[in-house]
């Protein structure tokens, strides 16, 4: 069952009729559906598939690669000692397929996990493509990985042998609200639009998370089961999520923990102070990686300079984790249901709805009739002032959730609220 992804499928299918071999990178957040998309697009064209192993040594990765070659039909071979030898085995296997007009797909999933320290993996991949695979006209090499920052740094923006070698990039985005509604309809979950929204505010548009919602159960019942009950499918997701994406996630987790405490975001200096991290290259790199992977966004208040940019945590699941999962210190198996109607629930829902609106700016622009107008999105806030001697409020604070600054000399001011509205997913 493939929901949405029409443009991505059209792009991948289009490569099957190209006159040259193709080097494709599919990347995006963990659990967003990359592997499923590739297998749906090329299900009858694969001649070799391999998946990197999380946390494995170079020797283990090489052994697994040889095993994949064996399963693909190569037969037994000597254990490769280097990635150069391993890709040489792959090339020898490919030569058993006569060159023809029909494309043959090589799919290497979770590629970043294969790049262990001092393995020369990227250089060997570079040689495999430039010296061998690109010489043919009937191959499609598809690489994939959840570590988006690794794919960007080592392949998309590579300035070595892989520079400008990619012929196609597919950055797979999470589902929109509309696509999640279609998913619920396809699974016969029976959810109204408001329930789809509630689920989206916690799960985001991550298909893997939505796959655990069971028919005949309300959103609250499903959340209690998958997040709070022993053996729930997403009970341990937080640790697995960041550990699988970043080799040394301590700095990344410190940043998102700090941002979770300040939902409107922090500027760099505030973030350093709150996270107690050192202002160095590692900190800057972690910020960049979190932004590339879609966990945080960097934005400027209208009229402010780039150096005054604010960093804000925007990943729906991560924020749900800090607001609810990490707060369930008593092990309440019905913590979500118990929280319904509480102050913490209303506070979370308001902020979560703001994020959902921010994640659907393009849809909002389309609904307001200016989707073709170039624009930038900002927020605005005013802290207000107090009398320094008495503490009495002199001027009240104010906030505008979203400002859309348009190139046609117009600014749209939008505020988001869940109170007393009839919510419809168009």
Where are these regions (language model features)?
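A cross-kingdom feature that marks ATP-driven nucleic-acid transaction machinery
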Residues: 302, 309-426
